[in-house]
Amino acid sequence: MKEIEIVEVRSGAQLEQALAIRLAVFVEEQGVSRALEIDGRDGEARHLLALQDAVPVGTLRLRRVEDGRVAKIERVAVLPAARGAKVGRRLVAAALSLARAAGAEAAMLHAQTTVQEFYGRLGFVAFGPEFIEDSIPHIAMRLPLREHTGQRDGLA
């Protein structure tokens, strides 16, 4: 079995590896516009890189939204050769750990509807109507990260 390691991006070279994975998956494979994929928000995000036997095979980015209370998981991408090896699951688990450590109350993401079930198995719940982004159907999903305090905070 190939070893999978999740690391936080700490260098420009690692960020380039992450961006190359995103371009391969979203732009080349799925036909997403490059302008939408490279949206100018990478500088405000933390990035994770999945290494399979030291080779970059997956990535995601994590941004704080809603006044920092919510961690938004974005740009989850795994190269085709590494799919089915739990790379995506490991990336999301690492992102949730970072979000909890940073004090986020919830995590959210916009899932392509073809992978909604994957995120559901990780505890995310869909909310709101389905929407189209760059010709691809998406659904917003959310996962509470802290115990409910009894106050209505609109997070779940």
Spell out what each predicted region is.
Residues 120-129:
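Conserved acetyl-CoA-binding loop of GNAT-fold acetyltransferases
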Residues 1-12, 147-156:
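Conserved N-terminal entry element of GNAT/NAT acetyltransferase domains
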Residues 49, 55-64, 70-77:
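Conserved beta-strand in the GNAT
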Residues 1, 12-24:
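A short, well-structured alpha-helix characteristic of acyl/acetyltransferase catalytic modules
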Residues 23-53, 61:
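Active-site rim helix/loop that mediates acceptor-substrate recognition in acyltransferases
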Residues 113, 132-156:
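C-terminal "cap" of GNAT-fold acetyltransferases
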Residues 78, 84-97:
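Conserved acetyl-CoA-binding loop-helix of GNAT-fold acetyltransferases
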Residues 99-112:
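Conserved GNAT acetyl-CoA-binding A-motif
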